[in-house]
Amino acid sequence: MRISIVGITGYSGMELLRILLQHPQVEVVSLHASQDREAPVSELYPHLKGICDLKIEAFDSQEIMRRADLVFFATSSGVAKDLSKDFVEVGFPVIDLSGDHRLPGNIYKKWYQKEPAEDHVQKKFIYGLSEFADVRGERFIANPGCYATATELALIPLLQAQAIELDSIIVDAKSGLTGAGKNPAASSHFVHVHDNYVTYKLNQHQHIPEIVQQLQRFDESLQQIQFSTSLIPLNRGIVATVYSKLKEPLTQEELTAIYQECYQEKPFVRIQATLPSLHQVVGTNYTDIGFDYNHVTNILTVVAVLDNLIKGAAGQAVQNMNLMLGFPETDGLLSQPSYV
């Protein structure tokens, strides 16, 4: 399977290349980005010298379709919706890591403050939360966001079990700095974020409608969630701490059974007996989930952790590719965490 990557110079694009270079069933044939000159990727990123020396090329949809069998878009929001149209029109497989095809046009425009993809194009994309989406044989996948992935994986088992009060859901999500993207900004400047803790986009984060839309698939009576996001001075990682009230008290054993039944055949979700930490998952495609119930307050706390560049982006995109093409789901994705 021949692969092209558009948006190679961003953090997710580089992580996607790293994973695909180790994949047993694919060959990366072209890399694309918006830059003034073509240059070997190893010239711009010396850690790739002798590993990948492909040139970074200007985007050309016809050339990509001539050389590749599938294209990944690891571009900023607002880019893939336009560049992917040529591929969609002829049925050429696309996996989009950005938010451009996750939401209906009117909702996308409100939350992203950008013009949406054309309606007939957006409707062809299936939302690829790998543990719950049936993407086998599909051609167009909208990869979930990093916050959305952690939050949805934490909550879906509880919705399926009808265990929680829907109007009590509060999510406190924290991200490492790569989640803010590569473009320099005052909000991610070293002096601003080092030795600091910054809450941002309170009640305004673009993953809110994505999360609500997907949770409603499991309980359509859910109306809204309370969702906050913060940056923490780490390179990688998402920690989603999810609070909700139970309809009826449950023991730790009963809660564990709910989660294990949901994820028993899902290789990249691990239910932990203790609350998880980021070191357990950084550098991997795993999501680790732990929980604790307070019988005094009737509040269940669920903690989900993942690597925002892997399970929250490039790793899940490859997981979706594997499922789409009928490859073993774990191909290219069985890296182990580096604990320290």
Curated annotation (Swiss-Prot):
NCBIfam families: argC. One of its GO terms (molecular function) is N-acetyl-gamma-glutamyl-phosphate reductase activity. Belongs to the NAGSA dehydrogenase family. Type 1 subfamily. This is N-acetyl-gamma-glutamyl-phosphate reductase. The active site is at residue 146. GO terms for biological process: L-arginine biosynthetic process. Pfam families: Semialdhyde_dh, Semialdhyde_dhC_1.
